[in-house]
Amino acid sequence: MKSSQRRIKRHAMRDMSISTLLLSVVLLPSVVSANDHVYFNPPSPGSPFLGPQIPLTGPPSLTNEHEFTLRHIYERGTNDQPDLHRRLDIKPHTRLWAVSDDGLEKELVTFDTPLVASSSPLTIQRLADRRPSVIEGYLTAARYNGEAVALSSSDWVMDTLAGPDVTKKETVLTFAKMTANDYIEEPGTEDWNYIHGRFNYSSSFGWQSDGLRGHIYADTKNNTIVISLKGTSPALFDGAGTTTNDKINDNLFFSCCCGQGGSYLWRQVCDCQQSAFTANLTCIAEAMNDENKYYRAAIDLYTNVTDMYPDANVWMTGHSLGGAMSSLLGLTFGLPVVTFEAVPEALPAARLGLPSPPGHDPRLPQTRKYTGTYHFGHTADPVYMGTCNGVGSICTWGGYAMESACHTGQMCVYDTVEDKGWRVALSTHRIKAVISDVLEVYDNVPPCAAEEECYDCELWKFFRSNGSETTTTSRTSTTTTPTTTRTLTCETPGWWGCLDESTTTTATTATSTTTTTSTCKTPGWFGCKDSTTTVDATAAPTVTTTIATPTTFPISSTTCKDPGWFGCRDPSSTTASVTAPPFSTSTSSDHVRADHSIGDGAAHPLTRMYLERLRQVEFAWGSDIEHYEI
């Protein structure tokens, strides 16, 4: 009997346990967090026993593989259209063209190759509250105070999140291809979504015009998105695509003083220089924070993208100028960043007043650790290495003032100069050449390390002001005006002189005459050799010598009646003599005349020699010398 009762009791307890278990499962909430403790049949408040518990799973894995596809293309207007912000959604039927580096060649895009990247744990020190409104408050205070806002350690956190695995070659290549893709929609098939601003933009405002472009990639689960910002247009001179606007932003962000104080070829984009190597830093910072500049446009673009994907993990990438803007966004909002051949951006990061963790100088953002930023590049690229600023560099001849030299975060450098013997040239800066000649050729990804002991604009002196000053640059021009001074009094001037009947002319002439007579008995080549020279102002008497002896010179006169080839063939010739008349020379203290007398030796020996030779010539040729003055 007792055994029968025990069996019935065991069956009842078993039935009660099964029904209790089923009831507990039915009463579970529909959504349960994986990190919360979930109990089957929770114990009563006074019970000392705990009910059965479901084993807890660990945190989500930070190591994963992502396959990305292009989802959107954003266009943010700057200079010409500052209110423009539009989005193009990529759909299966959307027809896109890929634009070449020079913007001239276009080809239809086919997305055959998947964009695959891996993620790994990444630690970033960033602000705990990263809402755009809070960040804007910090940036506004920095502009007003002239320096970054000082925050306490409680405002900062060390977050470990899923970031791009930059140790894998495939991941690096995928990000590089994202930066290389520059897409436009086939003309005539555009389907724009205007986010805000005016809706009556002209059709001439297109992809190759003013503005900042961003390509938005997302993985299959929309858990991770990548924002790729377009880099600098490769054309050197204004008028090709976004080249003019890119040059303005390049010279504003990466020059010591907006292109001032250097080469006359640099395009000057602000007026903040006070004197040689002295500039107003407040003026420069205000110009960089203008709403029509790339940094403000990049913040606006990022804010609208995160509104579409509020729970997604955001990664940034870009090439050249786009890489620098991506890095600035990463420092602002604490995002993982991978750039390629980026312009050194530590200089603008310091001037924008980005917040820095305690213990770090906000004026030296290159000293920060745990930024989550990786800059890939090679040693033959002068833009990446910060050396494209010499007098003979192509950057200077193109008007670019690329003076910054320091990167934030870590640099991952391919030493192509040492490994491949490349020479430093701007042609190696193009992203497609980097992909084909560097990233795909090297077997391994280079190690990444932070720059040490790097400083920008060491020759310059900067000062801050309250922002109310008006900064001007003085230019001195020299104008030459011809001046004519008339010394005559003329009421009716004419083409060939004054037409007045009488003209008054005032002229003063001073004349000084000195007459010196020297008597030298022993002349030399360089003066008189007499020990005493007598100077007398009285004219010397004239001495005349007459020679009565006639001089006879034979003169031959030939008459030929029968000339031949080699002379006259006549048998005889006649010779006549001519007697010259007497010749006299007169010598006076004023001058020597050769008119019928020869001096007696009072003249210089060279003078007597000359007169003797002159007499022989006269007698020989029968010349009639009237007057010679020596």
From Swiss-Prot:
Residue ranges, annotated region (Disordered): 577-599
Chain's role: Lipase which is essential for lysis of subvacuolar cytoplasm to vacuole targeted bodies and intravacuolar autophagic bodies. Involved in the lysis of intravacuolar multivesicular body (MVB) vesicles. The intravacuolar membrane disintegration by atg15 is critical to life span extension.
* Record localization: Endosome, Multivesicular body membrane; Prevacuolar compartment membrane
User: What residues make up the catalytic site?
Assistant: 320 (charge relay system)
GO cellular-component terms in the record?
A: multivesicular body membrane; vacuolar lumen
Q: Where are the transmembrane segments?
A: 21-40
EC nos = 3.1.1.3
Residues on the Cytoplasmic side? 1-20
Membrane topology of the entry: Single-pass type II membrane protein
Q: Which family does it belong to?
A: Belongs to the AB hydrolase superfamily. Lipase family.
**GO annotation terms (biological process):** multivesicular body membrane disassembly; neutral lipid catabolic process; phosphatidylserine catabolic process; piecemeal microautophagy of the nucleus
Q: What is the protein name given in its UniProt record?
A: Putative lipase atg15
InterPro entries, per this entry?
AB_hydrolase_fold, ATG15_Lipase, Fungal_lipase-type
State how it assembles: Binds to both phosphatidylinositol (PI) and phosphatidylinositol 3,5-bisphosphate (PIP2).
Which residues does the annotation flag as glycosylated? 200, 222, 280, 304, 466
Biased composition range(s): Polar residues: 577-589
Q: Which GO terms describe its molecular function?
A: phospholipase activity; triacylglycerol lipase activity
What keywords sit in the KW lines?
A: Autophagy, Endosome, Glycoprotein, Hydrolase, Lipid degradation, Lipid metabolism, Membrane, Signal-anchor, Transmembrane, Transmembrane helix
Per the record, ranges on the Lumenal side are 41-630
Report the principal subcellular site. Answer: membrane
The reaction(s) catalysed by this protein are:
a triacylglycerol + H2O = a diacylglycerol + a fatty acid + H(+)
